[in-house]
Swiss-Prot record:
Entry coiled-coil feature ranges: none
TM ranges: none
Domain of life: Eukaryota
InterPro entries: EAF_fam (IPR027093), Tscrpt_elong_fac_Eaf_N (IPR019194)
Species whose genome carries this gene: Drosophila erecta (Fruit fly)
Gene Ontology CC: nucleoplasm; super elongation complex
Compositional bias annotation for Low complexity: 251-268, 314-341, 412-444, 461-477, 489-502
Location of this chain's protein in the cell: Nucleus
The entry's keywords: Activator, Developmental protein, Nucleus, Phosphoprotein, Transcription, Transcription regulation
Protein name per the record: Ell-associated factor Eaf
Family per similarity comment: Belongs to the EAF family.
GO molecular function, one term: transcription elongation factor activity
């Protein structure tokens, strides 16, 4: 029944009656046939604009490539449609041809089966789209050339015959390329700006040079150098604390050199390494000779006449004590004159303050020594007056003692002059040594900009040299007893008179 239905449908469709017809074999079944061939073409898409009144063309190329060109109607605006595909041979397929006029049916063999697809490189589309494509490609090339990037331009150029369907894709691809190149070139520009101070040889002529200059850490000290407060800590400062530290060091060295100062004062040469502490210790050592001489004088007045013959040796001890006292007073002044070179490395103000303090200490020590000697002189005068009253009853012995004292006065004056000359020589030698040591200190000082320090030192040294004779004059004015072991000339004469009287009594 299905066959009848199919036949009925086929007979109805072909308008063939139910009658039996003869089937003829075509020329394709003839082996000698070379001019007739039947092919089937299968299209994927057939536009409605195809003009069936005109002939189409089929072009078979190498490798079984087939190009089919179908003409289109003039109203479509496109002259023809091009199909391309491949072909393959048939083996068992046949074609039946029905002739409506004669009613004959002919069967033919099929040669090739061709399957084609519509291409998008039509001539009309090609002529219309090429200006736009070229413009877009040129724009893309211009952007790439201006921005310095390499784009894949040969892709759109290699397909110049595409249809309108690829135009948006090509434009989109061009836009993608341009946007990508913009992003990439933007990042490259930033990288060039960042790396230009390191690698670029034209970094001086680049207008973006100012940006890395502010970022560079090497330019930071240039900004900090304008601020004076930040550079001050790098300059070494010498303050009053440093002066006190030097003073403490000199004080410790004075304790260490106490023995040296005592030996120097005993030999008549001042010790310049000693300080005020050694001078105070020298005062303590000075006191026993005076006290010892005073006790011996009191014992001489109370002792028998034979024991009074040892009195000149006691006066010699007193002279030695006075000479040591003068040398120790000069030794007190020597640290003052040595101190300015030590303080020459610092500021000049502490040097002046120390000189005034030392001057005050020296004046106080001189005043104390003068008061102690005056007390000793007063005690000695009272003792001598009592002894002179007890011995004044003997006139003969007094006349003899006058002769003896008159004989002794010239010798005493010569001794005093000789002692004064020795003191002046010692003082001159002391000043000469001080000048030499000061000159050595000036020569040994490093060249640290001492132009501002040396005038202060010179003025202070000159002031001390002027003060030294003044102090020496005060010492001489404080009492004539300083050169004679701490006793005045009258007291010495009275004591010598008493000793001569006692010697006369022994002779009688």
């Amino acid at each position: 029944m299905m066959m009848t239905k199919q036949k009925n449908s086929l007979a109805e469709r072909l308008n063939i009656g139910e009658e039996v017809r003869e089937l003829k074999l075509g020329a394709t079944f003839n082996p000698k046939n070379t001019s007739t061939a039947f092919h089937t073409i299968k299209y994927d898409f057939k536009p409605a604009s195809v003009d069936t009144s005109r002939m189409a063309s089929v072009d078979v190329g190498s490798n079984n490539q087939v190009t089919v060109t179908v003409p289109n109607s003039e109203s479509s605006g496109v002259p023809h449609t091009v199909y391309k595909g491949n072909q393959r041979e048939y083996a068992k397929e046949c074609l039946m041809i029905y002739d409506k006029e004669t009613g004959a049916i002919t069967i033919e063999k099929l040669n090739h089966n061709i399957q084609v697809k519509k291409t998008r490189n039509e001539v009309a589309n090609k002529s219309v789209q090429l200006p736009g494509q070229n413009a877009s490609v040129n724009m893309g090339q211009g952007q790439l050339h201006s921005q310095g990037a390499n784009g894949s331009v040969p892709g759109p150029i290699s397909a110049p015959g595409h249809s309108t369907g690829t135009a948006p894709k090509m434009e989109n691809s061009t836009m993608r390329i341009s946007t990508k190149t913009k992003v990439s070139t933007g990042s490259r520009r930033n990288n060039i700006i960042d790396f230009k101070p390191r690698n670029s040889p034209m970094q001086q002529s680049s207008p973006s040079r100012a940006v890395p200059v502010h970022r560079s850490p090497q330019s930071a000290p240039a900004w900090d150098a304008n601020n004076a407060q930040q550079t001050l800590p790098s300059i070494p400062l010498i303050t009053d604390d440093d002066d006190f530290g030097l003073r403490a060091a000199l004080h410790n060295s004075g304790h260490a050199n106490t023995s040296g100062s005592s030996t120097g004062s005993a030999t008549g040469q001042p010790d310049f390494g000693s300080t005020s502490s050694s001078s105070h210790m020298g005062k303590q050592r000075q006191a026993p000779p005076h006290g010892h001489g005073k006790r011996q004088q009191m014992q001489q007045r109370l002792s028998p006449p034979m024991a009074q013959q040892q009195q000149p040796s006691n006066y010699g001890r007193g002279y030695n004590g006075g000479h040591n006292h003068v040398q120790q007073q000069q030794q007190r002044n020597s640290p003052q004159q040595q101190r300015p070179p030590a303080y020459g490395h610092g500021n000049s103000m502490p040097m002046d303050l120390d000189s005034t303090r030392e001057h005050e200490l020296t004046s106080q020590s001189v005043a104390q020594a003068a008061a102690a000697l005056e007390q000793q002189i007063g005690g000695a005068l009272s003792a001598s007056s009592s002894s002179s009253e007890s011995d004044s009853s003997d006139s003969d012995s007094g006349s003899d003692s006058d002769d003896s004292t008159e004989d002794d006065r010239p010798t005493q004056g010569q001794q005093q002059d000789h002692q004064q000359q020795q003191q002046q020589q010692v003082y001159q030698n002391h000043n000469h040594q001080q000048q030499q040591i000061a000159q050595q200190h000036l020569n040994q000082l490093p060249n640290l900009g001492l132009g501002s320090i040396s005038p202060a030192y010179g003025s202070n040294h000159q002031h001390q040299q002027q003060m030294a004779p003044h102090q020496q004059q005060q010492k001489q004015q404080s009492g004539i007893y300083a050169s004679n072991g701490g006793f005045p000339n009258d007291l010495l004469q009275n004591d010598l008179q008493l000793s001569s009287n006692s010697s006369d009594d022994d002779d009688e």
